[in-house]
């Protein structure tokens, strides 16, 4: 399995320089989503002092013609800070800054789905929507070969790898542990992690997060994972079906509740939400991967713990359904439900916005409603 050339550089030499004092100056790494809707970009600027809140961070710009976001003749795009975290790579007082992207005319870029998501979340803030997203991913070599897999064959069939322990069952735990600790340091609401069903496949959970925080925290957790993998010389892919055949795909199961669902007899509101979702299946399928459902076509086959992409289904503790109600929720008559349809490479802003539109704003039909400002 191939690893990157950069990972073979002497990290001890780098540490000599990273341990130098930086005075009062602060490095702020600005992060944004590029024109693919999946890729992340970043660049760093120096600040004169440590910012205490997002309002203290300046706007910036970048060349959108190099990120699939504009033409060269009018390429400047604006970076508007939206969320700030501690930097686990450069450490305090340095920052990671997640940004929204705006075009030259100050309109949101096509892949800036945070902008409308924030408006929708503000409309239902009194219902306190909580989300938790289960991000699955697969570790690969730079040659595209799954991490730890035999070079000329396949590992043993699925079965022993889920939550597995041992060198023959857990592939790449060092990366998982490094990512987990880096997220905790950064202030990401990471809930846990586990090895998944396919060897070299892992999962981390983000949440519970209220409203717009869900997308901010998951995107920055993804960024941190990519940076950790960069240090180890490997790749983390969010492809929903990285290996064809009898291997599990990768999803981003999304858990959702409102204040009413979490309180006594909240199961009534959970069931009402599921009924609304059942009538808007195709709208959600289009929102749940960046290619309008094409990526999920490879994953949602009705096999490997998935539902069929063409059918809506729901059930208690049923991992072959579109929507799963956890057994505890069925017993306690309150809690949350899990939408198992989002793909691993989904945009969490698109997913959470779609859930709010259908379940709380009572939208119907195949298109989102256009609200007036």
Swiss-Prot record:
Regulation: Glutamine synthetase activity is inhibited by methionine sulfoximine (MSO).
Cited InterPro entries: Gln_synt_N, Gln_synt_N_sf, Gln_synth/guanido_kin_cat_dom, Gln_synth_cat_dom, Gln_synth_gly_rich_site, Gln_synth_N_conserv_site, Glutamine_Synthetase
Positions of post-translational Phosphoserine modification: 343
UniProt-annotated location(s): Cytoplasm, Cytosol; Microsome; Mitochondrion; Cell membrane
Annotated Mn(2+) 2 binding sites: 136, 196, 203
Transmembrane segments: none
Cofactor: Mg(2+); Mn(2+)
Positions bound to ATP: 134, 203-208, 255-257, 319, 324
Protein name: Glutamine synthetase
Organism the protein comes from: Sus scrofa
Gene symbol of the encoding locus: GLUL
């Amino acid at each position: 399995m191939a690893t990157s050339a950069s990972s073979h550089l002497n990290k001890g030499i780098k540490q000599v320089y990273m341990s130098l004092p930086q005075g009062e100056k602060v490095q702020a790494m600005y992060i944004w989503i590029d024109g693919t809707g999946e890729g992340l970009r970043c660049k760093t600027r120096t600040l004169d002092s440590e910012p205490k809140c997002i309002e203290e961070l300046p706007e910036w710009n970048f060349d959108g013609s190099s990120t699939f976001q504009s033409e060269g003749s009018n390429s400047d795009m604006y970076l508007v800070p939206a969320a700030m975290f501690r930097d686990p790579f450069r450490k305090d007082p340095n920052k990671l800054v997640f940004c929204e992207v705006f075009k030259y005319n100050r309109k949101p870029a096509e892949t800036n789905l945070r902008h409308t998501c924030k408006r929708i979340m503000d409309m239902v803030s009194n219902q306190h929507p909580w989300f938790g997203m289960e991000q699955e991913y697969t570790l690969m070599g730079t040659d595209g070969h799954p991490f730890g897999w035999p070079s000329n064959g396949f590992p043993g069939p699925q079965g022993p790898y889920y939550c597995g322990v041992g060198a023959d069952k857990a592939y790449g735990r060092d990366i998982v542990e490094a990512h987990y600790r880096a997220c905790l340091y950064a202030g990401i609401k990471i809930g846990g992690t586990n090895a998944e069903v396919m060897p070299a496949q892992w999962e981390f959970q983000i949440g519970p997060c209220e409203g717009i925080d869900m997308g901010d925290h998951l995107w920055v957790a993804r960024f941190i994972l990519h940076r950790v993998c960069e240090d180890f010389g490997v790749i983390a892919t969010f492809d929903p079906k990285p290996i064809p055949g009898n291997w599990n795909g990768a999803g981003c199961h999304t858990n959702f509740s409102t204040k009413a669902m979490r309180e006594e007899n909240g199961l009534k509101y959970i069931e009402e939400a599921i009924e609304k979702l059942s009538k808007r299946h195709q709208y959600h399928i289009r929102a749940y991967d960046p290619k309008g459902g094409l990526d999920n076509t490879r994953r949602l086959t009705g096999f490997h713990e998935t539902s069929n992409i063409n059918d809506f289904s729901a059930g208690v503790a049923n991992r072959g359904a579109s929507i799963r109600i956890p057994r505890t929720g069925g017993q306690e008559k309150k809690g949350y439900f899990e939408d198992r349809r989002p793909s691993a490479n989904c945009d969490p802003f698109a997913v959470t916005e779609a859930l709010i539109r259908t379940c709380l704003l009572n939208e119907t039909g195949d298109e989102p409603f256009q609200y007036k400002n």
